[in-house]
Curated annotation (Swiss-Prot):
Name recorded for this polypeptide: Phosphate system positive regulatory protein PHO81
Phosphoserine carried by residues: 956
Organism: Saccharomyces cerevisiae (strain ATCC 204508 / S288c) (Baker's yeast)
GO terms under cellular component: cytoplasm; cytosol; nucleus
Gene Ontology molecular function: cyclin-dependent protein serine/threonine kinase inhibitor activity; phosphoric diester hydrolase activity
ANK repeat placement: 423-452, 458-487, 506-535, 556-586, 591-620, 624-653
Length: 1178
């Protein structure tokens, strides 16, 4: 992603840091301005001067002359971010000190003994929010660090200087923002407190479990029968009446009773110690009692209990436990208790009717404007925040009561309704987010809201939240009744220190949000309102009522159709947007793509079909020279490919930058240096290459590939994102510390510890297909580097008997460990059919509490156990060539030569159920119309099925007769090699089913067979045969090429030996001759053998994955890949890209097809024969 766009997008997520980031865009424009010679206004020629008219030397000279101006601006930006960082760090330190003091106070006073206590919940939520603030500060630091580095890099390239490294080392890196470790310490201390809270939580849970045995007996007694229930209720009522007989009048008429209390009684109450009053815990108990009362089925009794709760519970408690200040503050104390209790109940699942009865019976003693002192630290929510954010109940009556019967003034209610909580949200935010239509409607018609579009800390307005959650009725009310802005303009931010507008506050565009969440109704409503507003403004013709565009680009430069195409939106939404004027061929501001590119890469065939109906163009190429069809083959699936093939592809391709060329040409023909101009950039003319060493004198691929001689290959693979780490769902405290990296360390001293940055990068290779020669230097400069790893960690060890691996998980920000686990040696000894297995390891925190699990895949490849062919004695597939070939070609590829040439006869090999390795025309045999897989049969069973002695081979063969023989007979591979002429070259096609084929076909594999053992036996036969040829006097090796559709088989073959090359073959994409459409198959073309064909439906939506195939071949040092000619024919650029990455490309041609004349392929696979060209260049 381009850094400028990335930085702009991040400002939406870090709204509180908006306008305080490095002004990267302004620095780029300054470089551009400083590079332009001073223009004379009187010269018409100068006014229309283009970049092509400016000599490059003049640009460099101008930048050197204005060097002081650029670095002056850069230093001001450094002062800005540094000053804001110091202020922000100071604020966070103060906030932590307050929270820490609260934590210590609560802990001493026993307020954290229960995880259900309000103090516990508030403290946990506050520390969780504080952790988020720390993470945001760290991201702010990293983004600015990257910004300064890239701005200096751009300066060096434009001015041809070398100031970047020196300035970063001597000026930027020594600033407090990049050197202080205060936030790291705060994060560690915060995590320590959260772990202690977690211990309290776990201890309480254990106590609850231990006490449950006692409560279960009571519950059984209370639920024996209906008669017993009735008797028990009567007995309980009688007992209550007896116990409270002397106090009924007092409870029902507490004001009168209080006035009649004698002075002796008051003196007795004054003697009670104030320290014994723990009002908070008692309020918690009252809270639970009211929730239990709400479950009573007798409605009249429930209502009576709620109405009398104040007298029967609260007032009695105050009489028995009040302090000396009771006589003076009894009413204020009672009011505080009832108000606090009511606020708790507002946020509870208590039904509205019960809560309303409780409120009406205590209305005179509940202050709706009350706000606890602790809440100013924790949440800053008032009663309207709590009512609006209650997810299960309406709570509308609270707003009605505040507006009608309460004693609150209108000004107070207005202040409460517009008050912001700790997340900068007003009650309208929560009501809109939860879809509380009546609550939103009541808020809007009060006319007390100062702003209907307030922006919270996540840059979201109530309208955006309603659209996100698909509350269309709320959206309609906000737009029509509240007058929410359907087309908001970024709000200016005033710099009070300078009394100027420093920047604008970035916010989400509602229509783009509706498109992102596939909200057709909201998009329709927004477009209708925007169109009407533009029509009214057009009639007005006033400068104050300018028409706003219907469609706006989001922070990453995507337009509405691009967003819909990327997420796979509803075709009706596409129709709606196009009906209102959206262009299906519009180019976005990020990748310079049209919407169909995004639909292809995201795999949305229905979107592609809809776009094609509206004349979306396919005869276009992006800046890298790739068409939508290329990306469909490169990283999409079969349905997408077939959707694109509905349109004829014989039209000449046009670059995307030629679309709407007239308007773009006009923009580029004049020099426009206004602050808002983003189209004109000197980067287009930049051709200065990155500093790079020349290619080595002897290319690495000249000497074949690495192989395992005695070491064991172990590869650990973490899953994309954070899928490998599963934290316990009910352990919210630990989950609040997001994993940021995993450290792997082994017990073996020779293995260096590794760090994996999280989240793990997905398998997509976004820029892998970019031409080396066409890579724009400016694009590299603008791209934000991804620090995340691909999750693969490789080790080579002598033995797995004593190999273990420790995994330590750390937060993304901080040094305190979150969790740890260990993989013991026995886990790596599990025999895997395809060499790949999965392990699940329990995760433990520092107190050895299990908090989740770590899931990862691992692959183990053992070295060849026998005597390999020594390279010094047996010529490998590569050979030394003259120095004239050891150069870099003009397209950036290393040119090497291979000894492979001529014709190679194809031999398919597989293992029987008894481990016998045979050569066969297909991986199955037909018996009375039934296809039986060879791996299901033993040698004896196979002979009975084929009805001949397959171990006996009569006569000798030449190339022609050998092909005919292999097309109809199943023979042991060892016997076959003995009778084949030594001059015959072979391509050994290794058949071994993949894990998915084993599961979906399904295929039964003998427990005595796995891919490691199978390849060991295969290599043993090949090596013995080669030695036999050498000792028989032939003096040379038989030329052999290994090929397989099983990716793991190719990898293992390449790691076990260096003598023979390995090709990875694709056979899972076929073209139906009747329909002309492509169909998916399994890697070994076994779909027709599936027991349940419905299980194979995934093949049409499974990724074609040519890009992953190419990347796998490169990572495992394979010689090349084999692709169907039908695929290469429809997209010739695939061949160029694959060959530019140093791989041989073999075109696989069907038996009924003609051999292509000259498609630039390294070889042709045709009719069970592999034909290599002479002098193959790689």
């Amino acid at each position: 992603m381009k850094f400028g766009k990335y930085l702009e997008a991040r400002q939406l997520e870090l709204a509180e840091y908006n306008s305080h980031f490095i002004d990267y865009k302004a620095l780029k424009k300054l470089i551009k301005q400083l590079a332009i010679p001073t223009l004379k206004a009187s010269s018409d020629l100068d006014l229309h001067l283009t970049l092509d008219d400016i000599d490059e030397k003049i640009i460099h000279q101008r930048l050197q002359e204005n060097k002081a101006a650029f670095f002056f601006k850069l230093e001001r930006e450094l002062e800005k971010v540094n000053g804001y960082y110091l202020a922000r760090e100071s604020d966070l330190r103060i906030k932590f000190n307050i929270l820490h003091s609260k934590y210590k106070d609560y802990k001493i006073n026993g307020k954290l003994n229960s995880n259900q206590a309000t103090s516990f919940k508030n403290l946990y939520a506050a520390f969780k929010k504080f952790q988020k603030d720390l993470r945001n500060l760290e991201q702010y630091v990293e983004l600015n660090k990257t910004g300064f580095s890239k701005a200096l890099k751009k300066w060096d390239k434009r001015s041809q200087s070398h100031d970047k490294d020196f300035y970063l080392a001597t000026v930027v890196s020594i600033q407090p923002i990049f050197t202080r470790d205060g936030p790291l310490k705060l994060n560690d201390e915060t995590l320590h407190i959260l772990l202690e809270l977690n211990d309290i939580d776990n201890n309480n849970r254990r106590a609850d479990i231990q006490s449950s045995t006692f409560t279960n007996d009571d519950d059984d007694d209370n639920n024996t029968s209906n008669n017993n229930k009735h008797n028990n209720n009567n007995n309980n009522n009688n007992n209550n009446n007896n116990n409270n007989n002397n106090n009924n009048i007092l409870h029902n008429n507490y004001e009168l009773t209080t006035s009649k209390i004698s002075e002796n009684q008051l003196e007795h109450l004054f003697q009670a110690s104030s320290s014994s009053l723990d009002m908070e815990m008692e309020i918690e108990n009252w809270y639970k009692e009211i929730l239990n009362i709400a479950t009573v089925k007798d409605v009249q009794r429930k209502h009576a209990l709620l109405r009398n709760f104040r007298e029967t519970k609260i007032f009695t408690y105050l009489l028995q436990n009040s302090s000396e200040s009771f006589h003076k503050n009894v009413f204020s104390l009672l009011k505080e208790c009832l108000t606090t209790l009511f606020l708790l109940l507002v946020a509870s699942p208590l039904d509205d009717n019960s809560l309303h009865i409780f409120y009406k019976s205590n209305q005179d003693h509940i202050d709706l404007s009350y706000c606890d002192e602790d809440d100013q630290v924790f949440s800053r929510k008032n009663v309207f925040h709590e009512a609006a954010s209650c997810p299960e109940k309406s709570r509308l009556f609270i707003l009605d009561e505040a507006l009608t019967t309460s004693k609150l003034s209108k000004e107070t209610v207005q202040k409460l309704l517009n008050a912001q909580d700790i997340h900068s949200r007003v009650p309208l935010h929560y009501a809109a987010e939860l879809g509380k239509l009546e609550f939103v409607h009541s808020l809007l018609i009060t006319n007390l809201l100062e702003d209907v579009d307030p922006i919270d800390s996540d840059s979201k307005t109530p309208l955006v939240l309603a659209i996100t959650n698909n509350h269309i009725d709320v959206v309609r009310d906000l737009l029509t009744i509240g007058g929410a802005n359907a087309s908001p303009i970024e709000k200016p931010i005033l710099d009070y220190s300078k009394n100027v507008i420093s920047s604008t506050k970035v916010q989400f565009d509602p229509l783009n949000v509706a498109c992102k969440f596939n909200n057709h109704d909201a998009a329709k409503l927004l477009l209708e309102i925007r169109s009407k507003q533009n029509a009214d403004n057009a009639k007005n013709k006033s400068s104050q009522h300018l028409c706003q565009p219907l469609f706006k680009k989001n922070s990453t430069g995507l337009c509405t159709l691009h967003i819909v195409a990327k997420i796979g939106g509803d075709p009706q939404l596409i129709q709606l947007l196009i009906r209102y004027g959206a262009d299906p061929n519009e180019i976005d501001g990020f990748n310079k793509w049209t919407p169909i590119f995004y639909a292809v890469r995201s795999g949305h065939s229905e979107v592609i079909t809809e776009l094609l109906k509206h004349n979306a163009r396919l005869d276009i190429e992006d800046d890298n020279g790739h068409s939508p069809l290329f990306y469909a083959l490169w990283e999409s699936h079969v349905d997408v490919l077939n959707a694109l093939l509905q349109r004829p592809l014989n039209l000449p391709s046009a670059p995307l930058n030629e679309i709407n060329s007239q308007s773009s040409t006009q923009r580029l023909n004049t020099i426009d240096l206004t602050p808002n101009d983003d189209k004109f950039d000197l980067d287009i003319q930049d051709s200065i290459p990155d500093f790079a060493l020349p290619p080595p004198i002897i290319p690495l691929r000249k000497y074949g590939h690495n192989f395992l001689e005695k070491k064991i290959f172990i590869k650990l693979k973490l899953r994309p994102g954070l899928e490998s780490i599963k934290l316990t769902q009910d352990n919210g405290i630990i989950m609040s510390s997001s994993p940021g990296r995993i450290t792997l360390s082994s017990n073996l001293p020779e293995i260096i510890p590794r760090n994996v940055i999280l989240p793990v990068r997905s398998g997509e290779i976004n820029n892998f297909c970019k031409d080396i020669s066409e890579t724009n230097d400016e694009e590299d400069d603008d791209e934000i580097s991804e620090d995340h790893d691909d999750g693969e960690i490789i080790f080579q060890v002598d033995s797995i008997d004593d190999f273990s691996m420790d995994f330590e998980i750390f937060p993304s920000f901080g040094t305190r460990i979150i969790a740890k686990t260990t993989a013991m040696p026995f886990l790596f000894k599990k025999v895997a059919i395809n060499s790949i297995a999965t392990m699940n390891l329990p995760l433990f925190d520092t107190r050895l509490n299990n908090i989740g699990s770590l899931t990862l895949d691992y692959q183990i490849i053992f070295p060849y156990p026998g005597n390999p062919l020594k390279i010094i004695n047996y010529e490998p597939y590569w050979k030394s060539t003259g120095s004239d070939l050891m150069t870099s070609s003009k397209d950036g590829n290393f040119v090497t030569s291979s000894s492979l040439n001529g014709s190679f006869i194809s031999v398919l090999v597989c293992a029987l159920n008894d481990e016998t390795i045979v050569a066969a025309p297909k991986p199955y045999v037909e018996f009375k119309g039934t296809k039986i897989l060879l791996n299901d049969l033993t040698k004896e069973q196979l002979e009975k099925v084929v009805d001949y002695d397959f171990g006996k081979i009569d006569g000798s063969f030449d190339e022609v007769t050998l092909k005919q023989y292999l097309s109809s007979r199943v023979v042991p591979l060892r016997s076959l090699l003995e009778v084949i002429p030594g001059s015959a070259q072979l391509v050994i096609r290794v058949y071994f089913p993949t894990d998915k084929e084993i599961d979906t076909i399904p295929i039964k594999i003998s427990p005595f067979i796995n891919i490691n053992q199978f390849i060991d036996k295969l290599l043993l036969i090949i090596f013995e045969h080669e030695r036999f040829l050498r000792h028989s006097g032939s003096g040379s090796m038989r030329q052999i090429v290994f090929s397989s559709c099983n990716w793991e088989a190719c990898s293992i073959l390449n790691w076990k030996q260096p003598n023979f090359p390995v090709l990875l073959q694709m056979k899972n994409l076929l073209r139906d001759s009747t329909t002309g459409k492509f169909v998916g198959d399994t890697p070994n073309c076994l779909k027709e053998l599936a027991v349940n064909p419905q299980k194979m439906s995934y093949l049409n939506t499974e990724l074609i994955n040519i890009h992953t195939m190419v990347q796998f071949a490169m990572n495992n040092n394979l010689l090349g890949v084999t692709l169907p000619y039908e695929v290469l024919k429809i997209c010739p650029s695939l061949a160029r890209i694959i060959k530019q990455n140093g791989l041989l490309l073999i075109a696989s041609v069907g038996e009924n097809d003609q051999i292509p004349a000259d498609g630039g392929y390294s070889g042709i696979y045709y009719a069970c024969e592999l034909l290599f060209e002479n002098n193959i260049d790689m």
